[in-house]
Each structure stands twice: as C-alpha cells, then as structure tokens.
Amino acid sequence: MAGLQLVTPASSPMGPFFGLPWQQEAIHDNIYTPRKYQVELLEAALEHNTIVCLNTGSGKTFIAVLLIKELSHQIRGENGKRTVFLVNAASSVAQQASTVRTHSDLQVGDYMSEDMTSWPEEMWNREMIENQVLVMTCHIFLHVLKNGVLPLSKINLLVFDECHLAITGHPYREIMKICEGCPSCPRILGLTASILNGKCDPCDLEEKIQNLEKILQSNAETATDLVVLDRYASQPREEVLDCGQYQDQSGLSERLLNELDEALNFLNDCNLSVHREDRDPTFISKQVLNDCRAVLTVLGPWCADKAAGIMVRELQKYIKHEQEELNRKFLLFTDTILRKIHALCEEHFSPASLDLKFVTPKVIRLLEILHEYKPFERQQFESVEWYNNRNQDNYVSWSDSEDDDEDEEAEAKEKTEANFPSPFTNILCGIIFVERRYTAVVLNRLIKEAGKQDPELAYISSNFITGHSIGKNQPRNKQMEVEFRKQEEVLRKFRAHETNLLIATSIVEEGVDIPKCNLVVRFDLPTEYRSYVQSKGRARAPVSNYIMLADSERTKTFQEDLKTYKAIEKILRNKCSKSAECNDFELEPVTDDDNVLPPYVLRSEDGGPRVTMNTAIGHVNRYCARLPSDPFTHLAPKCKTVEMNTGGYRSTLFLPINSPLRVPVTGPVMNCARLAEKAVALLCCEKLHKIGELDDHLMPVGKETVKYEEELDLHDEEETSVPGRPGSTKRRQCSPKAIPECLRGCYPVPEQPCYLYVIGMVLTTPLPDELNFRRRKLYPPEDTTRCFGILTAKPIPRIPHFPVYTRSGEVTISIELQKSGFSLSAEQLELITRLHQYIFSHILRLEKPALEFKPVEADSAYCVLPLNIVEDSNTLDLDFKFMEDIEKSEARIGIPNTQYTKQNPFIFKLEDYQDAVIIPRYRNFDQPHRFYVADVYTDLTPLSKFPSPEYETFAEYYKTKYNLDLSNVNQPLLDVDHTSSRLNLLTPRHLNQKGKALPLSSAEKRKAKWESLQNKQILVPELCAIHPIPASLWRKAVCLPSILYRLHCLLTAEELRSQTAIDAGVGAQTLPPDFRYPNLDFGWKKSIDSKSFISCPSACMEEDDDHCKLGTSSDSNHTAPESCSMEVSQPPEGAPNTPDEKLETLTLPVTDLNKDCFPNLPNGTQADSDDLPHRSDVCQCSQLGPLERDLSTQTTTSVSVRPSPAGEPQPWPSDECTGRSSDLCDPHVKKPTSKHCPKSETATSTPAPSETSSEDCRSACAGPAWDSPKTLGPNPGLILQALTLSNASDGFNLERLEMLGDSFLKHAITTYLFCTYPDAHEGRLSYMRSKKVSNCNLYRLGKKKGLPSRMVVSIFDPPVNWLPPGYVVNQDKSSTDKWDSDENKDLANGKASDDEDEDDDDEPEEAEVEPSKEDVNVEDDLEYYYEHIRFIDSMLIGSGAFGKKISLQPTDPGYEWKAPKKAHNSHFSPDGGADEFDYSSWDAMCYLDPSKAGEEDDFVVGFWNPSEENCGTDIGKQSISYDLHTEQCIADKSIADCVEALLGCYLTSCGERAAQLFLCSLGLKVLPPEKQSSGGSAELQYGWLKIPPRCMFEHPDAERTLNHLISGFLNFESKINYTFKNKAYLLQAFTHASYHYNTITDCYQRLEFLGDAILDYLITKHLYEDPRQHSPGVLTDLRSALVNNTIFASLAVKYDYHKYFKAVSPELFHVIDDFVQFQLEKNEMQGMDSELRRSEEDEEKEEDIEVPKAMGDIFESLAGAIYMDSGMSLETVWQVYYPMMRPLIEKFSANVPRSPVRELLEMEPETAKFSPAERTYDGKVRVTVEVVGKGKFKGVGRSYRIAKSAAARRALRSLKANQPQVQNN
C-alpha cells in the first residue's frame, strides 16, 4: 500500500475541522464561496455577448428570462427598443412566450405561423408598438429583417435558442450575417444544450466551440453542469491504481468461467424462432448467467458464489410463475448451473468466512484503501451516534425557514456546534461506483463480511443502492415501490451518516441528493466524460480522494481516455466564466502569504484571535453563509479583481445585500490576483469586526449574541422550586387571591363614620315562558322593598352594573351609595354582625369546619345587612326591627316543636304562606330542607287522593310513613319548590356559554311532567314550620355570593385600571364623581345572531366589553345590557309583568325604556344622553326587525334574537348571556350550567366575552361615546374579562382579547425594533422579537405587575372556594379544604351536596308525591343529575376512578359532547377539586375542549387526567397543596395570556397609542423614551417612533440606478392603487437577497419582518371586529387560514407581484414558475395549506406543489414598504390590502378552513399517527400517516410540515370518500 498516499481528513493540512463531511455546506478557505453557475452565466451575459452551454433545458430559460428583465429598462417607455427571442421550431414559440409573460410584466408577442410573413408593414408596426418582447421563429424574423420592418438598431437583445444550429446552413447563420454589417448590433445571447454528446474528440469539440463563437460574435461560457462541479469544489486528488491480474492459484476461477461460458454458448446456440412479440425464452437465463460471470471476473469466486445463491432464490420465483413449458425449462437449466457453481465453490472454501485468496486484486486494493480511513480509536461508533443525535432534525427541516420562533433556540445551538471541530475527526463518507446491480449487492456483502473478520474494517457500515426503478416516469408496480422505498431508506441512512459507505451503480452519479464525500472509488472505470465528471464531482468534501481501480490490461487504454477527459475538461473550464484563475491557485500548494500583509489581531497575546491573509477568505465565506436566506439561496460574496495599468491587481469585494456592510470593500494593490483577493478579504474582516458583525473570536455574530443587549434585558431567572419551563403551561404556581384595597380592613367600628351601600336588584329580563317549565310565578326583586345593603368603613368606587341570573330571569345588580358619614353604636353593630353571620351560615349554609367567622381579622370584612323603606319616607335604611325579630324567632335555626292536637288544632292563615319559606318538621332534623311556597292548592286537602297507588290519601301517607296524625283535615295543601342550592348565579342555567340555548329535553315533555300532580312536591302546612326570613328576601340572599364575588372581581379590575393609569398614564386615576361605566354584559345578544347585527355593526360595540355589551351606555342604566335585547320587551314599569306580555311593548322608544326600567336609579339618566346612541339602542332598535319576527312566535320575554329552530325553546336572553359561560356540556344539565359547568366549557364559551370586546374595538375607533371612557381607561368589566380564564366558566373570558393583544404585541414590538435598529438584519430582529414576545417574558412581566393574584382562574363555586366576607380560613382545620386531601374533599363536597341539592329530597319516601324520586324534585332534571353527579364526583376525585365514562345523557344523544385534551389552563386551580371540577367530571372527567371545538357545538371528547392536567404540577407528580378559598394555582402561560388580553383590552378601549404606553409600563419597550421636559412629572415620558432615516445607500448615482431598477413598476403601483412617495421602499420590497444588482437598497427581509406583523395585526383586528363576533376557536382558525404563506403567495401571484420580483436564483425561479402555472390552472384561491394539491386525480404523485416562500414574503414586504412610505399609517396599508384580501376573508368566514393535519386529528383523534420524517432520494421529506384500521397515506414535500399536511390531505380525502357521512365542517 506504500504507493498510495491518501490525504485523509485527519492528515490534511487544513486540520480536522474541514474533514467533517456533514458540514452541510463545506466552507472554502482559499477561494470565495462559488455562486451558482447560472448566476455567473447571467453575469457574463450582462457584460458581453455570450453563448450559454448548459446541460438542461430549464437552466437556459432562467438565464434568458432574467437577462430580458435586467435589460428591460431599455425596452420600456416611448421609444424603447425591442427584445427578440428566436426559436427554431414553431412549437416552442408559445412555451417561451408564456415563460416570459409569467415572470415579467412586459408585453409579449408570439409569432409562429408562416402566413405572418405576408403581413403588411402597418400590421408589423402596430405589433412592434404594442409588444416589448417578440418571440418568433427564425424564419419570420429573417423575413422581418430583410424587409426592414424592424431595424437592428431598435433591438436591444437577440436571444437564439438552440444556437448550435448556426454552425450549419440555418437561418441563424443568415441573421448573424446581417448583424455583422450593422454598426449598432444588439446584445446576443446564444443558448445550447448539445455541445457535448457521448464520446467526442477534444479537438473537434474545441473547433466546434470556436466556430460557434465566431459566428455569433460571442464568448462561449460553458458553465455546463459538467465543469461546474470541478470548478467549485476543492479538486479531489485523482489516482488511477493498477491492481494487477487475478492469480488463480486454485484454478477455481477458471472452472467456474468455463461452466458459465459453456452454458451461455448453449443458450446462444438454441436459435429458437420466436415471434417478434413473444419474449425470448432464454432472455432471463442469459441475463442471469452474464451477471454471474461479470461478478466472477470483477470480484472473484467468493463473490460469484454469493451471487449464485441470491440468483437461485430469485429464479425460484420466476419458475413458480412461468406458464410456458419451454421457458420454464430454460429457467430450470439456469438454476442447475448456478447450483453447480455453488457446489464447486464449496469444495474450495467455506462460504461462511471470507477468504481473500478467492477475491480479485481490485477487491483487495479496495479493502486497503478503506483501512486508511479507519477513524482514530477514540471515536469508533459513538461518533456516528453522536453525530446523528446532534443533527437529527437537520435532515428534516433543514431549510424550512418557516418554522416558528420556537425552534430558533434549538437551531442556534446546532449551528454553533457546526462551526467548531467536532469530537471526532476522521470519518469516512464514501461511494464506490460499480457498473452492475449484482456487483453492488455482492460487494456490499463482501465488505460486511470483511468487517466481521478484520477489526480494522469494523468501523465501516456499508449499504448498496442500485438504479433499478429510480426512473421518475416508469409506471411503478407494487414491487418496484418496495424497491424504491428501500433505496430511499439507504440514501437516508447515508445522508444521516448512519452508514458511511455506499456502493452504487451510476444512478448516484447525477441528481441524487447525497452528502459531499471524501472518498469516491470507481471500481469499474468510467466509460465516458460525463460519467467521469459526475462521479468525480461526488468527491466534494474539502479533502477528498477520487480513485479509479484498473486491471493491468485496461490501464493503458484508460490512461488514454483519461487524457481525453482532462483535455475536454480543460477546454470547458476555459470557457467557464471566471473560473480559470480560481483553479490555478486552488491547485498550487498553500504558500505562506501571511507575511505579505500583517494579520488583523484582536488581542496581542499569544494565540489571541486573529485573521491572517490565508484565513481571511474563509472568514468572509463563513460570515456570508450565516446571513439570513431561504432554502434556495446560498449567499456568497462577489469579488471582482482588475489588473491595474501599473501592473498590480486590485480586488473589490461585494458582500450579499442583506449584510449591514453594504459599501463595496476595495483592497490594496497586490502583485498577483490571488493575493489581491486575500488582501481584500482581510480588510473586509476588519471592517466587519468593527461594525460588530464578527465577534471577538472573529466568528460571525449569531442572532443570539445581539449587540443590542439592552433589548434583551437579561433578567435573572427567578429561583423557584416549581418544576417546568418558565412561561409554559406545564409550570404552575400558587398565588394569593387579590382582595381589593377598598374592601380590606373596612369592618365598621362603633362611633366611627360608615358608608352604607344598597344592593339594588331589578329584574330586567324575565325568564321566557318556554324555559319556565314549572310554570312558576316569576318574582321580580323590585316588587318587595326589603333588600340587602353593605355597611363598610371605606368608600367603594363605582363599578358597572352587572347581571345575576335567578329563577326569575336576569336581574341587574347595582351598588349605590345610600348614605355616608353616619355612625352606629356597639350594640347595633353586634346585632348587624350576628345577622351577617346568620345569613352566610344558616341561610346560605356556607359555614364549614375550615372557615371561622372573625370579622376583625378577616382580610375582607364588611357587613351585609337587611334594609327596608323607613316608614313613609321612601328611603331605604337599616332594618333593625327586622333583625331583632329574627333573633327572637324559634324557627331561626332549628325546627320549632309546636304540637297540634285535636283540642288545639292547626289553623291555616293564607297570608302567612304568601311569601314564606317553610321547613318540614318531621325529617332531616340536623339540616332541615327549606322550601318556598309556590302555590296554595285550596282545592286539595289532606284527604285528597294521593298521586301514587300505594297510599289512598295524603293523610294516610304521613300516617304510614311518619306516624303523624293531622289535627286539621280541611287545610289546603302547599305546592313547594326547593330553596335554591345553586349559588353560582353569574351565568344563566339555560344557556351554554356561547349564549345559545341548550337543547332541552323537549319542552312538551317537560311541561307535561310539571303539570301532572305526580311530579310536584306537595306538603301539608300543619307539618311545616314557617321560617322568619320571608321568601322574597331569601331569594335575594341566594344572590349574595354571586353579587359579592362579582363586586370583588370588578373592584380588583377597577384597581388594576387606576394602577395602570398611574403607571402608564393611560386613563384617569380616579373617575369623575357622576361617571359610571356601562353595564357589564356578556355580549351574547349581539352574537346571538350575527345577522341581526350586521346591519348595525356599531351598534353593538360595547365598550366595556363584557359588560356592557349592549349597554354600552355609559350610564349605569341598568339596562342591563345583557338584557338589552330583552329589555326591549320588558314592559314599562306599570305594566303587569307577566311573561306573556305581547309584542307591542317592543316598540317603546328606547330611551324611555331605559328610564322606565330604572326609574329610581340615581344615575339612570345621564348616560342616556351620550351613549345610548350607540349602545343598546342600536341593538334595540335595529334589532327590532328581527326581533319582531322572532318574538311574534314566542313570548316576548324570550327575545333571543335568533330565529329559533323550531321547537327549541328560546333561551332567555339574559341568560343567554351568561349562558355562554356555562355551556353546559350536556345539554341537559341545566343547572349546573352555570355553576358547574365544566371548565372546559368555558373554554368554549370564550367567545362571548370576547365578542364583546371586539366591538369595543370598533367603537374605539368610531363613536363619540368613546370619548369619555377613552380618556378614563377601559371599563373594569372589560379588564375583568381580560383577567378571566376560560376555566372560570364565566360568561366571558380572555381568549378573544388575548388573540387581538397577541397580534398587536407582535406588531408593536416589530415596529419598534424595525425603527430602532435600522442596521439589524431580519434574523437578529426576529430573534429579539421572539425573546420579547415569548410566553416566558410575558409571564415575568405579568408576575411583576401582580396579575396572578388578580386573575379569575377557577369556576366560582361558593361552597367550595369562596370565602364569605368576615370569614377566615382556620389553619388547623383548613386542611380539609386543601386540594390534596381527598377525604375532606368529599366532606366538603358531600356536604355541599346536600344543601345543594336543591331539589334533593333525599328521601324519596316522602316523595310527597313522588313516584320517581327524580321526577319529583328535580328543579329541572338537570339540576338533579347534576347535583348528584357532583356528589359522585366528589368521591371520585380522590378515588382514581377516572377512566370510566359515566354517561348522563338522558336526552338528546345527538348533542354529543366530547372532551378535550387541554387542561383548562389552570383548570381552576386544582383546587376546586371536588366541586369544582366535578361538574366536569361528568363524563368521568370528560370535558369540552375549546381548542377542539370547531364550530359552535361540536365539542371533542378526551379524557381528563387529573394528575396531569389539573394538578398542574404533573411534573414532579407532587400535587401542589393550597387553600382553595384564599389561593389559586395558575399555569405560567395563563399569566402570559392575561398580559396579552389586557393589552387587547387597552387597545380596544383606548386605542393604539394607549396600548403602546401600557406595554411600556409593563416593561416591554415599544416606544423610545424621551428626556422629560423640566415641567413634566418625574416619570418617563415616551415619544413617538421615528421612521429610519435612510432607505437608500449613499451611492454616486443612486437616483439614476433607482429609476433604472424600478422601470416598469408604474403598472404595479396602479394595480395596487397606491403610489409610492419614496420609490426606494418599493424597490426594496421586491429585492431578494440573491439580487446583487441592486446596490442602493437592502433586500426585502427587513420589510417582510415588518409587513408580516402588520398584516397579521390588521387581519386579526378585522376578524375580531367582524359583526359576526367569531368565537375564539373560529378566530384562531380564520387567523391561521388567512395569515399564512400559502395565502399570501397565492394573492401575490394573483396580483402579479411575481412579475416585478427581483431575484437571481435558479431554483427559486423554477418553484415560482411551477406555482404560477398551478395558480393559473386553478385560478382560485386555496385554503390553509402550504401545498396546494396539484390535481386531485394524480394520486400517484403524492407530492403537493410547493409554495415559494419568497412570494408570500414579498406580499408581506410590500405591506411593510407601504407602512413606512405612508408615514406609518396602518389605515393606508389596509386600504391597499383589504381589497385584495376581502374575497378570501369573506369566503373563509363563511366556511372556516382548518389545516388538514388538524382536521384529521379531530376526525380520528385516537387512531391517526404521523411517522417521523424520511428523506426521499431527491432530498425531499416524506411523512406517512397511519389511520389505524383505515390505511396509510404518504405525503412528500420540501419540509416536514409540508409533507405532513400533504399526507393528512390524502388521508382525509380517502376517509371522506369511504364514509360519505363524515360531515365536512
């Protein structure tokens, strides 16, 4: 082996760093990274007449089109010249013309028919005027020239397609003759692909080229792809090794040859006459034996034996399937021969082990070469593993720049590694080329065998690939498909370096994507030039060897061939533009030039970083490679070297246009070209370092090492023991629940001034009839004067009125100051305190062991007490008399034990029972049930017939069951209702969270049920005690927890608002005295039916969102907004309030309405004036139309505004509103809805609130009403919405606001970064942006701002997680309420459950009338189930019985609900455990998942796994223990969401500037700070962003260059209807990074970064404000459907952006070309996905068309350009873009597209599984999705994401085809 000196990477002078074959692109160290050859050809063509010799047709068009575009400024305008494109055949005219049309906006004429030669001159003149580019056949052009129609002087460019024809006598020749005589001859471009065919003689070749050059007066530039490889890569070392003859000592080889030759002769002699169409019967046999013989001669007997074994197996298959007897005999004959060979071999060697005596010298030589590549010890195999693990993803999304920022960090890590030497240095990456398939297969076996026997070769992991079936166009059968797959797997492994040696047939020579190899062995010599060059070109690693193995007899002849090849190569290389000088010095040894110029040294110490002459070029290349670019562009520096007259050389270096160093760098004069290039690179490194583009190690600065540290205010990571990544959903932390300052420590003190507030309650929307199943009478709270008040020592700020939903309908609550400054005595206060405790402990039964009443210590302590009208003053005051009466009553706590006897019978007094709560005295003594008297049945007595057959009469029932005797058998009976156990009245029971009615079990059934006596609870007055608290007050008491909770939340929000007013200067710190925000409402009305609103969008804006949807009015008018719509129907005060009031009332003038409804509200009037106009009234009025319609069919109250589907009862709107929140999953569960609705629902619900907001937004922009609040800040209701998570199941949540905030945040930060760092390129900007908008950062800021404790995280469930005022959590006992302890939990809930059970009559026995327990007392069936479930759940929660499905769906299976997979964020803090969640636990924890629910009602079911989702911490599996009453547990990500939602809230209420100030106050800089003026307050003032000053570089004749570059853009401006004031922005928006001719502006990347955020914000804002009030789920889907590259690219093509696009990138050109063709055929927009389908039928081609990201980018960059050009006006951008996007927005809003992947996962959540990516042989990615039981589907694309969605699309198509019933939503 001595003769062979291989330079393996480790021994290379460049050091191990360059040996890594996988450095994705090797970086050259002493030549500038070469650019794509097409680019260089274009450059040449721009400089002089050129003949382009290319191998492919496509490359030629690219060069021709780009050249035409580059010179197009000469052909536009009045006396522009014309460009002529000549083709040889008429058939190619149309094709070339259409390519030019596609890629430019020039007018193209095509002329091909012979009769055009007879056209009169004026026709030609007209054509010349109309068209700028003329594509014609050479004959027509010749005619035109001869007739002088178009003089040559009017032509700027003449393109000859297939110009080699000019050598023969062809019209081209004559055309050129005419040109020769002409002084002003046009520029000439010749295109040819056929200069080299097969073997040709170098002399002929040279002559042919010279001849052509002469005729066309051009220089031939063969960047044929043939040389290109050489020219670029460092040349591999070529060796021809003569291996000598095989010495056949044993004679085995000879015997085998004889056998085979004899057999072959026999086959050849059988001259069977075969019909032409029949198969030759000996064909297979000959083929097999020839292959075997070839293996024998090339590899030797050992391999021939292996080959024979393989062949025998293959023959068996043929024999089995062969029908023809004769053919079969030949196959059997062959089989015998092969077996004979095997037998002969066995005599000489054992087939098991490899014996080198029986292989040829070539094989031995090959093994010796492989020995040389053995890695050093330390990195045997793990190195490969290490490598694979490191780079795994590189192979997948190697270029998918669209991946989100999430991956950026990961990527960064990877890149840095790639720049430094890896831990192992000498790894083989080699290919062995052989001629035949069998040679490859067997050689692979041999190498594997050798590896087993020779430890030195153990490092080799080889595989083979054969070209069989890789042909793209052959029909593929199953088996080929399998083969094909195998090959791809082989290639994948080779690319991933899992295998390091590939044995291949010529297939791998061209067109297959494989890594750069450092060893290429031609086992069989190349037979033609192309094969030589292609295989040599595979050795592209910087240190590589190209070894050709020859036998002695062929060595001589081959040496000759090799000379020929080298000569051809040389000729071609000389024709290669600019290549000559590179090669000369590439080959000479690296001399030490370092002393020519001193190195640039950073620090003088030894080994300090330095750049020397020799390393400078490498540094520049490496820098360029790190600039941002897309998969198609490899940025490289451009160096021009000129010879000076003085004799030296000077180079000028141009960096890619997106580098901040834009000025060309000119180097010193040196005495040779190579030194000049090195010197200029050295200078360039110095400049790059000085401007901060190279770091102090002189490596390119990554985007991470930003020089803008201040931007990334690096915060110390907080230390917490909490596991999980900060900012993620997985990490949860506890925080105390906030208590508003005004409620802290405000317990009244004797003799100190107090404030008394009245809790006003007005029924604004009575319950509609259809929901009033029991036909209960409604009890408007305003009918009785006694009510509750709040007594406190501190004033309470004004807050919006808000609704609660009782059994009577929607009640609007107001908190009004009644009197202040008075004081009370100690006795009075004690009485009040006792009564306060009595309300919470006895009436509401909220006291439990964990809570103690200690008003003085409690965090929030104020008194709740009864008020009544004082004598006749008509003013409310404290009702001391009533309090004293209660104290005295015996029924106050227990059950009085009055005994009635026959002597002292019971006497019935009707008036005692009119407004009474009664207690049965004969059961449940510890916690007696309390009932409202609903009706007195005077026609029934205890002797009436008992409803069920077991008992005759009621008296008998009581006697039998309880042994009770009645003293009065004539008393009437009482129909009673349970007092309410539902204490969460925040949202209505009958609606889901979206404000849609829940499907009810049919109304008729229910009515029937409640009307029959059987289903009523009937009690006997004598057996009951009357409670001292009247029913009317009791009903109000039930509302207290909800009212106080809502009050508390609104005050927290108000506090946040005034805090922000101080911090950010947005809004007023204190409100004007008479100001009140509009009511809180859920905005459902609006959304109820979008249609009604479309007419009046502004109508609904409510500003404060949540609250006031309708009521935007700022007054408190209690029109509860929600109620608004209903309100309409509500009669003026005097009218009887019965539900069936008919429509007329609707017509009331709105204003009165408001007044009437609240006649006595103090501030009822003010608002009307100003906001009504745009508030409810619109809704009201405009709604009348629709309302009327609806109403007529239903009773008024039900105004819900959406025509109800028949039979479905209308919900009461009011409820409606709330309902949303509750969205109960199961339709039936009425009651729970509100309270319990599973969190998830909430999620669904989200829409509501947000809806509201959207409106606001609009209003914000719009109406007058805004002025007032705008200056005050957002309505606390809206802030509350932003603080409410969907898990809280309230009537609103932050999701819609969050989406709006999210897009505004992105926009604000983007604009700030863009303006503040005019020099940072897009990669850096997006890195800074991703850091600032990351959830982790937002979470930090939100936490600093104190949001976690103010957020509303879990569902409000008074018995479980609400702390009544004046109570404290008793530490010792509190464990009972900790989330972790289960038993107590049960306790807690269990207990709750009883009282909750509103209807629970535990003892069915006494069903008074109840045959079936449930019927009886279920307030609504649901209520009952629900309670029940709750109870069960509470038990379950501890027991782990989660997997079971408890299905409670008595009715309506159609409404299936499915559960989600998300923890509803903080689900409520785990706490709620029991109760809380129970609801959801319905389906054993099934819960709705908003994220999945696509449309309103389809929810998705998943299973909730408490350990994960809920406890939040699943990480350490430890559960977080915390107190439910005073703490809440929140996922970090929810805090980040809340920050975005608050931003959305400020944005909609106060406008963009306020939102920016709000961000600055959080600590996110989005405005430049200003030095405050002396007079100003101390806090920081923020200025306005300034547009970056320069968009054009200093350049001698910038203006002229600009006009030259944008010639033709006028048409574009008129197309988009916007004229740029500064055209440089326009040019920049269309300049791709590869377009180096633009020397005056940057490329579009920065503008794209800006435009992307602007369009995202504008589109999101538009969708948010859509009157249809899309739900959050729909909003998300619409946003992703509209804001994505596919849509943008499609629109860009539709509006011709591609015709003005400036790029020099051949691959990009082709992708755009394909895409444009595709769009033209489709001619309609596509949804969601980046890979629009090509055509539905061609199933075989599972690849989708690729969407050129650059097209989407320029669509965005133009938006950025307009924004900057218009002085940062979003309106201007939207005026230009809305018309383009409108059709799509409308189309998608009507039918929301979902991404195929998501749709598939929703359709088959359990069964669809995506495979990891595989690489296909041409470098694309393939993904397979398996839908278990329904098949596997594959998709292919340039990135994993694209391939994945292609696979999903195929799967969907197939699934939908097979089951038509899959509804396509």
From Swiss-Prot:
Enzyme Commission no: 3.1.26.3
Gene Ontology BP terms: apoptotic DNA fragmentation; cranial skeletal system development; global gene silencing by mRNA cleavage; heterochromatin formation; melanocyte differentiation; miRNA processing; miRNA-mediated gene silencing by mRNA destabilization; miRNA-mediated post-transcriptional gene silencing
Record field: catalytic activity: Endonucleolytic cleavage to 5'-phosphomonoester
Residues involved in ATP binding: L54, N55, T56, G57, S58, G59, K60, T61
Predominant place of localization: cytoplasm
The DRBM domain, residue ranges: 1792-1857
Binding locations of Mg(2+) 1: E1298, D1377, D1380
The keyword Nucleotidyltransferase belongs to this UniProt entry's keyword annotation: no
Biased composition (Low complexity): 1240-1252
Keywords: ATP-binding, Cytoplasm, Endonuclease, Helicase, Hydrolase, Magnesium, Manganese, Metal-binding, Nuclease, Nucleotide-binding, Phosphoprotein, Repeat, RNA-binding, RNA-mediated gene silencing
Polar residues compositional bias, start-end: 1111-1128, 1192-1201
Residues of the site described as Important for activity: K1749
Quaternary structure note: Component of the RISC loading complex (RLC), or micro-RNA (miRNA) loading complex (miRLC), which is composed of dicer1, ago2 and tarbp2; dicer1 and tarbp2 are required to process precursor miRNAs (pre-miRNAs) to mature miRNAs and then load them onto ago2. Note that the trimeric RLC/miRLC is also referred to as RISC.
Family: Belongs to the helicase family. Dicer subfamily.
Name of this chain's protein: Endoribonuclease Dicer
Organism: Danio rerio (Zebrafish)
